[in-house]
Amino acid sequence: MTTPTNRPRTWILPPLPFAAAILGGWWLDRHRWALPLGDGDRLAWLGWLLVAVALLLFAWSLLTLRRHGTTVNPYRGAAALCTDGPFAFSRNPIYLADGFVLSGASLILASAWPLVFAPAVWTAVRYGVIRHEEAHLEATFGEAYRCYRQRVRRWL
């Protein structure tokens, strides 16, 4: 059973700030104040490419977590420290994928609004989620996590 002492004390569900930035940006762009981002037709293909890369990275991350018998759920404790697959080059490949979706959606929508919200999104994820996950991982895996943190960057 997962108790508050053996799981991260995450404040928010990580995809929510990303989704809010995309949906809020779309709504503002269409209903209040357009903030166009170049020629939508020319940039949309790049946006779809970013979303495709994000989906592949997300799937690879999920498969790696599953292979190690641990969870993607930010409200549950980690059962294993994943240091291979996408976790060999990023400590947060799922949030990196979320960032690719945010950027891709901005290009697909041809709206700069999601990118305007990006600093607030990254701040919310950094302090509302990652800080708590990292504290949990260090408390759970100790020196193994500290070595991993020294070896692998947070993003890329």
Predicted feature descriptions by range:
Residues 92:
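Extended, alpha-helix-rich binding/interface surfaces that flank or overlap catalytic cores
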Residues 87:
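Solvent-exposed interhelical
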Residues 1-84, 96-156:
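Membrane-anchoring alpha-helices and their flanking helix-loop junctions
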